[in-house]
């Protein structure tokens, strides 16, 4: 066993991959029972959709990450298909999953909105767990902080993994803290654990959707819209703390914040449109 994973027969299984896989599995279980509870379509179709969606979601998540990190990958083409060490963007996976859902529902003659209201619950479970993969990879963290929630990461981790530039370029290395504990001493950076913030935000959103909004749902697709609003607002706020955001070229504009705004606006517009239609 290493800090990054478990070694079985000479093959190292990364914690990152195990957490992503666990997120898929638990998300599937939650969506299955949600479909069973709502009883609007055969719950077994949730399994069929997951099998159909896994590969496109992973490809989409990786493609999104590579596109917005092209300045690096254009000189490291062989690394494009290496995902064991991270580099999967949630937005890319969600977009690919949504496209796959549209095609799947068309072929199965299902309501995409009904199916989507069930799927977002599993999606949130996957996102809640998936962010902990970032913890083990020591990525997706925020700027310097000395608050109660500060996460300490040894600078040696970045040196050993050839990632020292990550904390030098954003000024975190200059703010590193030298800590002595007994006979041992190490240098740490102190950062916002943005992966934790997003994981907890999504947990609250999931609980609200399951225990509050599901019972009060007035039309198909309402839970999708609430997810878009809730996740969009949370992601926009939390993304502002991160030091590794994917940018639009050299503009300094964070891609994820733009998409978060689009999600929130879309969700709000959809709810207003549907509720206005109901009152007519």
Residue spans for each PLM region:
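A feature for loop-to-transmembrane-helix boundaries and adjacent hydrophobic helices
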Residues: 1-280
């Amino acid at each position: 066993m290493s800090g990054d994973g478990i070694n079985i027969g000479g093959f190292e299984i990364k914690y990152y991959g195990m957490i992503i896989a666990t997120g898929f599995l638990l998300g599937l279980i939650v969506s299955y029972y949600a479909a069973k509870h709502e009883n609007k379509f055969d719950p077994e179709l949730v399994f069929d959709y997951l099998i159909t969606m896994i590969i496109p979601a992973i490809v989409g998540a990786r493609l999104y990450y590579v596109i917005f990190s092209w300045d690096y990958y254009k000189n490291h083409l062989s690394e494009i298909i290496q995902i064991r060490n991270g580099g999967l963007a949630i937005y890319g996976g969600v977009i690919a999953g949504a496209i796959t859902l549209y095609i799947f529902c068309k072929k199965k003659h299902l309501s995409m909105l009904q199916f989507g209201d069930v799927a977002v619950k599993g999606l949130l479970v996957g996102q809640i767990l998936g962010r902990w993969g970032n913890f083990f990879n020591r990525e997706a963290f925020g700027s310097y902080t000395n608050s109660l929630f500060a996460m300490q990461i040894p600078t040696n981790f970045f040196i050993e993994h050839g990632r020292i530039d990550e904390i030098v370029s954003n000024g975190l290395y200059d703010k590193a803290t030298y800590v002595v504990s007994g006979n041992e001493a190490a240098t740490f950076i102190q950062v916002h654990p943005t992966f934790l913030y997003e994981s907890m935000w999504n947990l609250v959103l999931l609980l609200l959707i399951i225990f509050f909004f599901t019972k009060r749902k007035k039309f198909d697709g309402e839970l999708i819209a609430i997810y878009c609003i809730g996740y969009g607002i949370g992601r926009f706020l939390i993304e502002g703390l991160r030091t590794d955001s994917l940018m639009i070229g050299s503009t300094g504009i964070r891609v994820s914040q733009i998409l978060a705004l689009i999600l929130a606006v879309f969700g709000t517009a959809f709810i207003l449109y549907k509720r206005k239609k109901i009152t007519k």
